[in-house]
From Swiss-Prot:
It comes from the Eukaryota. This is Probable sphingolipid transporter spinster homolog 2. GO terms for cellular component: late endosome membrane; lysosomal membrane. PANTHER family: SPHINGOLIPID TRANSPORTER SPINSTER HOMOLOG 2-RELATED, SPINSTER. The modification Phosphoserine is found at residue 466. It comes from Arabidopsis thaliana. The lineage of its organism: Eukaryota, Viridiplantae, Streptophyta, Embryophyta, Tracheophyta. InterPro entries: MFS (IPR011701), MFS_dom (IPR020846), MFS_spinster-like (IPR044770), MFS_trans_sf (IPR036259).
Length: 484
């Protein structure tokens, strides 16, 4: 019977049922790797990834160009911008270079998740990430560090499309938004720690040392990706062939993979709820991306903040933690539905935009910090709800690709163009206050787009049947995480 059924196990319901029973075999001992430990590991990896983003934007690592006064007195530059003599535009391009690798690799990793142990994919990606940041520390000009930043994006791609679905699957039913919020809380927290980390390292060591430190932090998690037992995502059934499980990265034929990805992409593009959510997210990320990169420099120039990295880092970490967690908890309290998620997104972004815009109108640094902190608190409340919509408006088997394309979209149309465009605007107007006000105004269209989603006919597809051919072929092991 095993031989006869081996060729069509992805489509035979009896075999699928038998496979489901085998997963629950009591012989398989529960793993020490509990859902909370899984969340912890993903959070730390996410934190390190965004520490890197914050560090490269910090004044300590990014630095400034050399300058000369009208009297002929010249001062040498500092950091990356000073060593490589980068213009503001080139500096903005450097912040966005990771997106090239992320754009190319995200759909590939998402499609491979149907046939390859996803933790092996994460292990490969984090290994590439580690080598890439080492390369950043060894770079010698603009193009060498830019290419290394592109490979940082390749490494990140393996992680962004798979982490959130795993968390969503293993979180308690009434705490899904809160668990997602904890994970996405690591984005502003990582940026903030990155500002502080960059400022501290840049003040005592060469800027290159910051990248080598990041590589040391990430290396254990890259190794973990290769040695941990496999997890199975909802919507991807293990194909038990009776053969020993292999961890080799065997993939489906190229033609099949490409056609499957294109078919899935079409399903995403015609989903009004998904598209509306992503359009709002793009406008939102356009602002947040430029804030994160240019914020310390703008604060230093507008308000003469002597410790801009530390101040922005402190405000961002507190507001990021409180705001992100609050958004997830509020959505769970309201009843986590797609319509309610859109309500949280539109209201918090609109009110937050008012406070952030008003902050830049004040000349007092203390008034600015107070208003901007409230604005950031509200704006960061979006992280849990926006990703809840991405995960629940599509079928389970589409979630990795939905997350991948969400990440690609918000970067390629959001923070990738925003950093260099803000640099161009600043080069033109030479006034950081005006530049910051123009940038902040973009939050209002984001709130308006998300408000449209409240009135769409939204259906939570989390419990819809998965596609019969969505099979993780290389694993016969029981699920790593089991409900208590």
């Amino acid at each position: 019977m095993d031989v006869d059924g081996e060729g069509d196990r992805g489509q035979n319901p009896r075999i699928m049922e038998r496979d489901s029973d085998s997963i629950k075999d009591p012989i398989s001992e529960p793993s020490w790797f509990t859902p909370k430990k899984l969340l912890f590991v993903f959070c730390v990896v996410n934190l390190i990834n965004y520490i890197d983003r914050g560090a490269i934007a910090s004044n300590g690592i990014n630095g400034s160009r050399g300058s000369c006064t009208s009297s002929g007195t010249c001062s040498s530059g500092s950091g990356i911008q000073g060593d490589f003599n980068l213009s503001n535009f080139e500096d903005g391009v450097l912040s966005s270079a990771f997106m090239v690798g992320l754009l190319v690799a995200s759909p590939i990793f998402a499609s491979l998740a149907k046939s390859v142990n996803p933790f092996r994919l994460i292990g490969v990606g984090l290994s590439i990430w580690t080598l890439a940041v080492i390369g950043c520390g060894l770079s010698f000009d603009f193009w060498s560090i830019t290419i290394c930043r592109m490979f940082v994006g390749v490494g990140e791609a393996s992680f962004v499309s798979l982490a959130a679905p795993f968390i969503d699957d293993n979180a308690p039913h009434d705490q899904k938004s809160a668990w997602l919020a904890v994970f996405y809380m690591c984005i502003p927290t990582g940026y903030a720690f990155g500002y502080v980390y960059g400022g501290v390292v840049g003040s005592v060591l060469p800027w290159r040392a910051a990248f080598w430190g990041e590589a040391i932090l990430m290396l254990p998690f890259a190794v973990l990706g290769f040695v941990i037992k496999p997890l199975h995502l909802k919507g991807f059934a293990p194909d038990d062939t009776g053969k020993p499980r292999t961890d080799n990265l065997n993939v489906l034929p190229v033609g099949y993979g490409f056609s499957a990805v294109m078919k899935d992409l079409k399903l995403l593009l015609v989903d009004k709820v998904y598209v509306t959510n992503i359009l709002g997210y793009i406008a939102y990320n356009f602002v947040l991306g430029a804030y994160s990169y240019w914020g310390p420099k703008a604060g230093y120039n507008i308000y003469k903040m002597e410790n801009a990295d530390m101040i922005f880092g402190g405000v961002t970490v507190v507001c990021g933690i409180v705001g992100t967690l609050s958004g997830g908890v509020i959505l769970d309290y309201m009843d986590a539905t797609i319509s309610n998620a859109f309500k949280v997104l539109s209201v918090s972004t609109f009110i937050g935009a008012i406070f952030c815009f008003a902050a830049f109108c004040f000349k007092s640094m203390y008034a600015f910090l107070a208003l901007f902190a409230v604005g950031e608190l509200l704006v960061f409340a979006t992280q849990g709800p926006v990703n809840f919509i991405v995960l629940h408006c599509v079928k389970p088997s589409l979630r990795p690709l939905a997350m991948a394309m969400s990440t690609v979209s918000i970067h390629i149309f959001g923070d990738v163009p925003s950093s260099p465009l803000v640099g161009v605007l600043q080069d033109y107007v030479n006034n950081w206050r005006v530049t910051s006000l123009v940038l902040t105004f973009v939050l209002f269209p984001a709130a308006a787009i998300w408000s449209i989603g409240i009135f769409l006919n939204s259906v939570d597809r989390y419990n819809e049947d998965s596609e019969p051919d969505a099979v993780t072929r290389e694993s016969t092991a029981a699920p790593l995480l089991q409900e208590a």
